[in-house]
A protein has these predicted regions:
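Non-catalytic positions within long, well-ordered alpha-helices that form the structural scaffold/packing
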Residues: 58-63, 174, 196, 231, ...
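Short, ordered loop/turn segments at secondary-structure junctions
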Residues: 73-76, 144-145, 187, 208, ...
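Short, active-site-adjacent cap segments at secondary-structure transitions
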Residues: 76-78, 147-149, 189-191, 245-249, ...
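ATP-dependent carboxylate-amine ligase
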Residues: 1-27, 37-43, 53-56, 259, ...
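Acidic, Mg2+-coordinating active-site environments of NTP-dependent enzymes
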Residues: 77-83, 176, 191, 200-364, ...
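Short, basic phosphate-binding NTP loop
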Residues: 2-119, 126-137, 223, 307, ...
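Receiver (REC) domain switch/active-site residues of two-component response regulators
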Residues: 67, 201, 417
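Phosphate-binding loop of NTP-binding sites
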Residues: 97-242, 246-258, 386
Length: 505
């Protein structure tokens, strides 16, 4: 999928902002909120952010050739004097209107493709990745791993880009041939209105567990942010994991006119094969069977019974697979075709990705689990595939919710046989302090080691583990960097695990 070229050659501001303000009839080449991406002829959009204001970067934008500045006079910041050749347009309430402005600028790309927006604490990436694969050659993925048609992706910066960048990427995907797009939607994106202006006929919730409380403050605020997805423009279907407590509540208060598909992947608690509590649309597991090659799921939908085999492992991946099945059915894909496409779909990079260290060595598993719930689920999934000891290498991110650190320790101690505590993006915090907060949650009944150098920690666990053992390397997944201070240093758990596996006799 070639996404190299932009299809927008320039738009007149008077037309773009019609109905908002009277703007001059000048043409701008592109829109951007990031001063670093400004090119000559662009309009720089300067708005208040979480920790700074776009006007703080105005000088940089002008130096790079911005020909116009759009700003909101109601945000309490005055616009500095501009060079005579630069046009300024003040737009009251610009932040609330920017999604629609960007949508118009890029030719309303979400009218040219059917989008599925997926939110939730855990599982967004896997679900979107699986869904994009099921969509085939006309499908695309946009999220944490980048954007494009799996497995060939262009790197991205955020799970969900800002509203201008998002519309730009959608236009590129559509122009490259995408007609169905699976989109990860983060709680930050929903809170910051990054998906405003995007039409999302299909929506889904995976689950809601503790994460991002450094940003949202409370679980109630976190849940409220997630719920905004189902009030976005053009929502027609909501596919919700009702095995999750928040999901069950959300399913009772969807907006009028939104068709609900209930997904239940836990046979012990699932309703009988007539559907989830009488729902007209449902995907319900009646049996989940783990085996050496993955999962076998037996279930029932409003279209009849189903049987699904997948190379993915773990009960949580049964939830992910059934959620994607629900999205496919809601999007009009026939059940046999949906099952066939899911059977051949593979897990994304860094999501329970296995590296076998020869016949005499352990299996290394790289995973993105970085919340207590995700870590517990990954350990539980791997326990079913571990004849020997289960090791866990993990840490906790700096400048993020410190309250989850002892919880991560408790979960790791409960689920693993041996632990290695290490660094995981300490950022501007003291790494020793982070490790100390993690160890405070340990009781001491499981073997535990501390090795702050992450590469050495992984190598230590790989050397100490034996054939039949599994080493879960948790927290970073696909990431290829380690953040110390404000510096990103090259570091890849996947690359190291692959090298250790290749070097094993």
């Amino acid at each position: 999928m070639n996404m190299a070229a932009d299809s927008v050659e320039g738009v007149e501001l008077a037309w773009l902002l019609a109905g908002l303000v009277a703007a001059p009839r000048i043409t701008v080449r592109d829109l951007t909120q990031d001063s670093r991406s400004v090119r000559p002829g662009d309009a720089f959009v300067a708005l208040a952010g979480v920790s700074s204001h776009g006007l703080d970067y105005l000088e940089d934008a002008l130096a790079r050739g911005a020909s116009a500045v759009l700003w909101d006079p109601t945000e309490g910041r005055a616009l500095p004097p501009l060079p005579p050749a630069v046009t300024s347009v003040s737009v009251p309430g610009l932040k609330a209107e920017l999604g629609d402005v960007a949508d118009r600028f890029y030719g309303e790309p979400s009218t040219d493709a059917a989008l599925a927006g997926i939110t939730g604490t855990n599982g967004k990436t896997t679900c979107a990745w699986l869904l994009a694969q099921c969509y085939g050659v006309r499908g695309a993925y946009l999220g944490t791993l980048g954007q494009g048609r799996p497995p060939e992706l262009t790197a991205g910066t955020y799970t969900t880009p800002d509203c201008i960048a998002l519309q730009r990427v959608l236009r590129r995907l559509v122009d490259a041939g995408a007609r169905r797009i699976a989109l990860e939607v983060s709680s930050h994106a929903l809170d910051q209105q990054r998906v405003a202006g995007v039409r999302l006929p299909l929506t889904a919730l995976t689950n809601l567990t503790r994460d991002h409380l450094d940003y949202h403050g409370t679980m109630a605020a976190y849940g409220a942010a997630k719920e905004r997805l189902f009030h976005c423009r053009g929502v027609e279907h909501a596919v919700i994991n009702v095995g999750d407590g928040f999901g069950r509540e959300l399913a009772t208060r969807l907006p009028a006119g939104v068709a609900l598909t209930r997904v239940e992947a836990h046979p012990a608690t699932a309703p009988p094969a007539g559907g989830a509590r009488g729902a007209a649309r449902f995907v319900t597991a009646t049996r989940v069977i783990p085996h050496a090659a993955g999962l076998e799921i037996e279930g029932v939908t409003q279209h009849g019974t189903c049987q699904l085999r997948s190379p993915l492992v773990g009960q949580f991946n049964a939830e992910n697979l059934l959620l994607v099945l629900g999205l496919l059915l809601a999007g009009g894909v026939p059940l046999p075709e949906a099952l066939a496409s899911l059977t051949s779909a593979t897990a994304p990079p860094g999501r329970l990705e296995r590296f076998v260290c020869g016949r005499a060595g352990p299996t290394l598993v790289v995973d993105y689990a970085h919340t207590p719930d995700a870590l517990a689920k990954s350990l539980a999934a791997l326990r079913l595939h571990t004849p020997g000891r289960l090791w866990c290498v993990f840490g906790c991110g700096g400048d993020r919710d410190p309250g989850k650190r002892p919880l991560m320790a408790a979960v790791a101690e409960a689920g693993a046989d041996a632990l290695v505590l290490t660094d995981d993006n300490p950022r501007t915090e003291d790494p020793e302090r982070i490790v100390a907060m993690i160890t405070a949650g340990l009781t001491g009944h499981v073997e535990a080691h501390v090795e702050r150098d992450r590469a050495r920690a992984i190598e230590f666990a790989a050397r100490r583990a034996h054939a039949g053992d599994v080493v879960l390397i948790a927290g970073k997944g696909h990431e290829d960097y380690q953040i110390y201070g404000h510096e990103r240093r090259p570091a890849s758990d996947r690359a190291l695990a692959a090298a250790l596996a290749e070097a094993a006799p």
